[in-house]
Amino acid sequence: MLTIKNWQLLSENDKKLCLSRPRQSSAIKENVLEIINQVQLSGDKALYDLTKQFDRVNLQYLQVPQETIEQANIPQNALNAITQAIGTISSYHQSLLPENTEISTASGITIRNVYRPIQKVGLYVPGGNKTPLVSSLLMQAIPAKVAGCPIKVLCTPPDAEGEINEHILVAARLCGIDTIYAIGGAQAIAAMAYGTESVIKVDKIFGPGNSYVTQAKTLVAIDANGAAIDMPAGPSEVMILADTEANSEFIAADLLAQAEHGPDSQVILICDECELANQVNQQLEIQMSYLSRIEFIKQSLANSRIIICSNQSEQLDIINSYAPEHLIINRKNPESWVEKIVAAGTVFLGSWAAETMGDYVTGSNHVLPTNGFARNHSGLSTLDFMTRFTVQAINQEAICNLGPAAMALAELEGLDAHANAVQIRLNTLGD
């Protein structure tokens, strides 16, 4: 069960350790670099070889045939659920579409903001046949579609027969994606970043993954010849803030829902007193007994803990210091806490706000910053699939009025060619 820590009794160093996340092996970076180099050098051949090495599959093709996508079929109840999710996710991301605005900053000057969709985007969905992560696809494909990205490609690992789960194919089809590659892992990220004979090189890569995928995204993002990325999304995490009135059964269920993602996931409960902590631990044991991903859960809980802290100011400091991917405020008057939160990927309010709902059907995006990146990153949105540039119009009146100031600043910085570009125009107007 979860280790219980009394915050007031911890030293400053122990407090830091209490909020530390599982560390990634330094060997991963070297392994991923080797994979990226192999894809860059050998292209499609490397993808076939690496898939055989890591997935133990002899692929017959890299790109899923169009006929296979069109003929994919799933049970009606699954189709209904996907359709409902598409509706709410589309509504939310439509609301985020920006408007092209124009402002006059001075007489004779107008500046217009213009938004454009990124032309080529690559979506990554982890998991093979046993775990078709349809929701991960929807959370990327829908904002890409809403933004108007003309080229959308999907990479996802194949199953043992080299095929893609039909739930993924149907969801992709419903979201307007017809270019799908049966490739997973760091090699998929490398293929989309640099392109191969078969895989389209994209401008930006999206999607979560394991430590290899996250490392690959980080490496291609710092290479000028690679591709931009959405965010460095690592292992999933949740932090729950609960008072004495919170339902321990609900809390345990939310902790387990996050813990089952993988062995490096982390869950933290902050509560006022030991009684609730003990009740939650009891519930964890009860609920774990009938869950399927028990090995993942056990490893995750070993990285996790319960923090006893009765001081609300300190509770707030813990939250903002940790900057959780998911924050559940399961206590009285949860709304009153929101204005004090400065670092969180997404916040769930009240006892009925199961984090699972946000993962699938509320419409909000579940691709969120982890590992403390919520301090300076936001969850995925329509804007991430767009670029913005400004259009500046300057007439004669403006250059007469503001040109001398521009020249003075240019000369202050020792850039006389800058000053000259204005002076020549002023001279022309003076003739």
Swiss-Prot record:
Listed GO CC annotations: cytosol
Recorded catalytic activity of this chain's protein: L-histidinol + 2 NAD(+) + H2O = L-histidine + 2 NADH + 3 H(+)
Pfam family, one: Histidinol_dh
PROSITE patterns: HISOL_DEHYDROGENASE (PS00611)
Positions contributing to Zn(2+) binding: Q258, H261, D359, H418
E.C. no: 1.1.1.23
GO biological process, one term: L-histidine biosynthetic process
Active-site residues annotated for this sequence: E325, H326
Name the UniProt record assigns to this protein: Histidinol dehydrogenase
Keywords: Amino-acid biosynthesis, Histidine biosynthesis, Metal-binding, NAD, Oxidoreductase, Zinc
The protein's required cofactors: Zn(2+)
Note on how the cofactor is bound: Binds 1 zinc ion per subunit.
Uppermost EC category: oxidoreductase
Cysteines joined through disulfide linkages: none
Protein purpose: Catalyzes the sequential NAD-dependent oxidations of L-histidinol to L-histidinaldehyde and then to L-histidine.
UniProt xrefs under CDD domains: Histidinol_dh (cd06572)
Positions annotated to bind substrate: S236, Q258, H261, H326, D359, E413, H418
Assigned protein family: Belongs to the histidinol dehydrogenase family.
Lineage: Bacteria, Pseudomonadati, Pseudomonadota, Gammaproteobacteria, Legionellales
NCBIfam families, sorted: hisD
Pathway: Amino-acid biosynthesis; L-histidine biosynthesis; L-histidine from 5-phospho-alpha-D-ribose 1-diphosphate: step 9/9
SUPFAM superfamilies: ALDH-like
